[in-house]
């Protein structure tokens, strides 16, 4: 790793402060269940009506209005990811990112928020037009210590603090290990670090923004309790496109690595635009602080949500209708459900213009 821009101390975030909840009453706010945009209908020349569905049938569906560019991308604007209910769009002509809360079910319809980030800086021999994903270190980019991380396809990883409007700028890192070129960045609240799983899931890279370090911490994973697969299962796995997803349960403090195995539906190349992928297998590993990744078919009351958003976990018992011990998956052309107990997969083909799961949001009255 190499830090290629001058150090900006404003980027570093403080160590988290622990707050003890009152013993006399619950401090947990009422929250929406996880949700996603099920469909959209044009509403005038510049907006669409979003049909938002929740992961539990016991919560009423919602209709929201949003700018058309958030669901119908063009050469000028592309949505590139989501974190904590904030969607990021890349404005190609000016080379800047903008954060929107339009897809957040509790955000204002009449007064949506827009946060413009500083102009992107492209490092030598890097690119900033294709983005793997974005991650926020806290619930809102308006919070003073919130850091936005952007992982670009290839070498570059960039950070900034949106709340520092007067002197906000990007803090750019160049990654040389090719196993991280297509990785997705996530923020670990437990470790107070941004983390990247390497391709194949053998290596984890972590950046501690509380310390002035120009190099990340690396951790090699050791796999345990691997399942015995038949020859046919191994051949299927080897023929799949594999992706790794790091997800943290904030309620239990556990960390999981999820491996997805997907195949093209009609045998076309992944390089062909619009290629349909179908989930053929899922493997979940519980990862400890020592780098042990233990295969598991039991995550208890938890449900994991994977999409083009930053992955997240919820306690299923907190949201009646959400299935425990499941992985929910949402992609551009598929929604699927994986049951860890028996490794069964239910998959549906559908076109999603905004394939983002939104995590639970606090409901304010």
Model-derived regions, located:
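A non-catalytic, helix-rich entry segment at domain boundaries
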Residues: 2-84, 89-96, 103-105
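C-terminal closing repeat unit and adjoining cap/tail of repeat-based domains
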Residues: 3-6, 46-64, 69-73, 270-365
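Detector for intrinsically disordered, low-structure N-terminal pre-sequences
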Residues: 16-18, 36, 47, 67, ...
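Short, surface-exposed loop and linker segments with low hydrophobicity and enrichment for Pro/Ser/Thr
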Residues: 18-34, 43-44, 135-145, 244-252, ...
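N-terminal non-cleavable signal-anchor helices
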Residues: 18-20, 38, 69, 248, ...
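Generic structural signal for residues positioned in beta-strands
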Residues: 36, 147, 184, 245, ...
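Pocket-edge structural micro-motifs
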Residues: 38-40, 91, 101, 259, ...
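A sequence/structural signal of beta-propeller blade repeats
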Residues: 74-76, 80-267
């Amino acid at each position: 790793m190499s830090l290629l821009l001058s150090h900006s101390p404003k980027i570093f975030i403080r160590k988290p402060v622990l707050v003890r909840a009152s013993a006399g009453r619950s401090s947990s706010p009422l929250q929406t269940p996880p949700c996603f945009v099920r469909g959209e209908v044009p509403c005038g020349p510049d907006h669409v009506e979003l049909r938002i569905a929740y992961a539990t049938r016991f919560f009423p569906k919602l209709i929201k209005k949003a700018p058309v560019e958030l669901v119908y991308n063009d050469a000028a604007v592309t949505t590139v990811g989501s974190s904590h209910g904030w969607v990021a769009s890349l404005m190609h002509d000016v080379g800047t990112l903008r954060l929107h809360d339009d897809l957040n079910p509790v955000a204002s319809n009449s007064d949506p928020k827009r946060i413009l980030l500083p102009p992107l800086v492209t490092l030598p021999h890097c690119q900033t037009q294709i983005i793997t994903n974005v991650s926020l270190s806290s619930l809102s980019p308006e919070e003073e210590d919130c850091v936005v991380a952007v992982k670009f396809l290839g070498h570059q990883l960039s950070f900034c603090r949106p709340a520092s409007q007067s002197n906000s700028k990007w803090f750019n890192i160049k990654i040389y290990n090719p196993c991280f070129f297509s990785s997705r960045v996530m923020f670990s609240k437990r470790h107070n670090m941004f983390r990247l799983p390497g391709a194949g899931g053998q290596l984890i890279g972590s950046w501690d923004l509380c310390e002035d370090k120009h190099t990340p911490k690396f951790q090699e994973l050791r796999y345990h309790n691997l399942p015995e697969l038949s020859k046919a299962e191994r051949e299927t796995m080897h023929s799949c496109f594999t992706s790794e997803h790091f997800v943290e349960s904030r309620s239990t403090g556990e960390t999981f690595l999820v491996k997805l195995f997907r195949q093209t539906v009609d045998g076309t190349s992944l390089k062909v635009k619009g290629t349909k992928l179908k989930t053929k297998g899922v493997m979940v590993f519980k990862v400890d602080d020592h780098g042990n990744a233990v295969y598991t078919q039991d995550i208890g009351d938890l449900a994991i949500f994977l999409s083009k958003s930053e992955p997240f976990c919820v306690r299923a018992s907190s949201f009646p209708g959400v299935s425990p011990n499941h992985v929910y998956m949402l992609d551009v052309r598929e929604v699927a459900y994986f049951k860890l107990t028996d490794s069964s997969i239910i998959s549906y083909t559908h076109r999603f213009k905004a394939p983002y799961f939104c995590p639970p949001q606090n409901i304010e009255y």
